[in-house]
Amino acid sequence: MAGRSPAHGFCDDEQTRRLLRSRPPRQALAWAGACLGGPVTSARALRGGMSSAVHLVTARRPDGRRGQAVLRRYVRPDPDEPDPAAREARALRLAGAAGVPTPALLAVDPDGTQAGVPALLMGRLPGRVDWWPSDLDRWLERLAGLLPRIHGTALPPGETIPRFAPHRQENYRPPGWARYPRVWERAVEISRDPAPDLPAVLLHRDFHPGNVLWRRGQVSGVVDWLGTCAGPAAVDVAHCRVNLLTLGAEVAERFTTLWERAAGTVYQPWGDVVAIVGFLDDLRGDWGRERLLVEDMLARAVAGC
């Protein structure tokens, strides 16, 4: 969840910050250089998530030309997301082939034998993250329009895409600040029930404005495909809805209306329940006004399930 820091940047923990931002080790740079056709001359840390170190690397080729790529190293293993490099590489191939704007996959080291840890090398997309658009309606319309394109990606027979499973939490008790503890308790029960019988589509699983790049008012790319899986479209819609509470409840609802129009279907509130329960560990801190908006959204969703 982007939460109160829409920039979606690095963790405030100093040890984690060093792990994610420090210059990649020689082994990783040697692998990247071999893929790019020359030694790496620079590596600049990019903003990214919490499980991987992301750097823009520049290599000098024998003919004097420069080659640039994004090196992503999965330096923080997550038992809930095994084989991260292979999983993201598979997602990039599928979504890219379907016309979704994604980074070009240049190379993958699925087990870390060459780069030291599992790693991807990707083309660099133009554009930047934009959480505060000058034209909110157009921004929301284009954001919502991305999801049917992602969800329309064909899943080839025999393709091994993990099935959606809710994120596990350390503690499922209601947050200490909860006004409606019973709502939270019921939400946990719903999240543990079998998912509704809805069509399974390709999910980004971490779709929100912090993972969408823009250039001159147009979407230039969707990044961070680590959590890709197959499941109900409502999972992606809900994840984005909760993150959009940063901009207000009315913005989240407007996004949903635009998605329904683009997808030609009706949103299922089950998605909100699963998404918010999946944020429980993150929601135990001081979230100010946003925590009230999250709880109100959850109460409406529980009532609608």
Where are the language model's segments positioned?
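Short, conserved clusters of charged catalytic residues that mark active-site
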Residues: 27, 38, 87-90, 142, ...
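An alpha-helical support segment within catalytic cores of ATP-dependent transferases
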Residues: 23-37, 148-205, 300-305
